[in-house]
Amino acid sequence: MLNNKIDFSKYDPKLWFAIEQEKKRQENHIELIASENYTSNYVMDVQGSQLTNKYAEGYPGKRYYGGCEYVDIIEELAIERAKKLFNADYANVQPHSGSQANFSVYTALLNPGDTILGMKLSHGGHLTHGSSVNFSGKMYNVISYGVDENGEINYEELLRLTKKYKPKMIIGGFSAYSGICNWKKMRFIADKADAYFVVDMAHVAGLVAAGIYPNPINYAHVVTSTTHKTLAGPRGGLILAKNGDDILYKKLNLSVFPGAQGGPLMHVIAAKAIAFKEALEPKFKTYQKQIVKNSKVMVERFLEKGYKIISGHTFNHLFLIDLTNKKITGKDADIILSKANITVNKNTIPNDLKSPFITSGIRIGTAAVTRRGFKENEVSKISDWITSILNNVDDHNNVLQIKKKVLEMCLKYPVYI
């Protein structure tokens, strides 16, 4: 009988200590990493349930193991909610991550050596959009498009490259782009080469679900996403499609299982189902609207303080700060801000002369701070604290004073009550 009589803190004190410290860090730090968010207690509870014990290779009604009648119900719930949330005809909720979702889609639609066209990592793309260190850059012939001098996607370049190289697939989406993607125009360009148009909406899935950011589902052949970030669910992946056919959907399913993965993580799929239900509620839309409001306020504040924002604006949850004229690297900014309990991430900027380990910029996102209740007043203060620290990096007393203010704000707005 599995009845743990010894308290966890006594059974494994080292692990317990690390977890407790991480809990405190999340409560006492202002989280501005654009890819991070806080899940609900429901999501965390489900992930710690008995579902973690169940193996369920295959799909609902077509499993390779017995005893799947209840996990079938759970996966079907997740599928139907995902389809409703994003107005899709097809959903696969099994990918363990966004990268796994992308890998599955690529292998379903492409052959090794095919040409793909994705956004440059240094211009705001993602590793899986063709980076040389990633499977996408190793398996396929990669051509990259980027942003223009104004920090906007260069559609003329995209069209020119499409006509010249005739890619089998064009990848839309980003990890560090603050503009609005013109999915319709990108599909038009893809059609010029009879190419698949795949959109990775991982960063803006929550905004899309709330109707605040354009939904790519009517333009892309296939859409992929993570289920955390702005969607605020568990860490996982998702594949969606609309107006496809059974042949496409079967290819996608087979590419996920058995192509890329074995048994699905049923405890995570259940958590996805809960997250999709939460995202269908009216208050989720209010939350997403506030994310963008906060992001815009921060951009305005940084501009007022003389900081350069790539593209000069934001229409989503994130933006990039170019620190070139501030004589500080992204890495150093990351380090000094962390001493004041403000967490950001160093990030390359378009045409960055520094390595990805150093960078000339930082990326800031507002999904997590908005989740804990911060509004315009709070994020405006945070912007001022950041500029105060970066303008005076050697003033350690200033860092300590701001850290006190950060702790006061975090105490006023706890993540988990």
From Swiss-Prot:
Site (Plays an important role in substrate specificity): H228
PANTHER family given in the database record: SERINE HYDROXYMETHYLTRANSFERASE
Pfam families: SHMT
Enzyme class: transferase
Catalysed reactions, as listed in the record: (6R)-5,10-methylene-5,6,7,8-tetrahydrofolate + glycine + H2O = (6S)-5,6,7,8-tetrahydrofolate + L-serine
Family: Belongs to the SHMT family.
Gene Ontology molecular-function annotations: glycine hydroxymethyltransferase activity; pyridoxal phosphate binding
Entries under HAMAP family matching the protein: SHMT
Record's function text: Catalyzes the reversible interconversion of serine and glycine with tetrahydrofolate (THF) serving as the one-carbon carrier. This reaction serves as the major source of one-carbon groups required for the biosynthesis of purines, thymidylate, methionine, and other important biomolecules. Also exhibits THF-independent aldolase activity toward beta-hydroxyamino acids, producing glycine and aldehydes, via a retro-aldol mechanism.
Annotated SUPFAM superfamilies: PLP-dependent transferases (SSF53383)
Predominant localisation class: cytoplasm
Residues bound to (6S)-5,6,7,8-tetrahydrofolate: L121, G125, H126, L127, S355, P356, F357
Required co-factors: pyridoxal 5'-phosphate
A GO cellular component annotation in the UniProt record: cytosol
Identification of the protein by name: Serine hydroxymethyltransferase
GO biological process, one term: tetrahydrofolate interconversion
Keyword Amino-acid biosynthesis applies: yes
Subcellular compartments: Cytoplasm
Complex formation: Homodimer.
Keywords: Amino-acid biosynthesis, Cytoplasm, One-carbon metabolism, Pyridoxal phosphate, Transferase
Residues bearing the modification N6-(pyridoxal phosphate)lysine: K229
Pathway given in the UniProt record: One-carbon metabolism; tetrahydrofolate interconversion; Amino-acid biosynthesis; glycine biosynthesis; glycine from L-serine: step 1/1
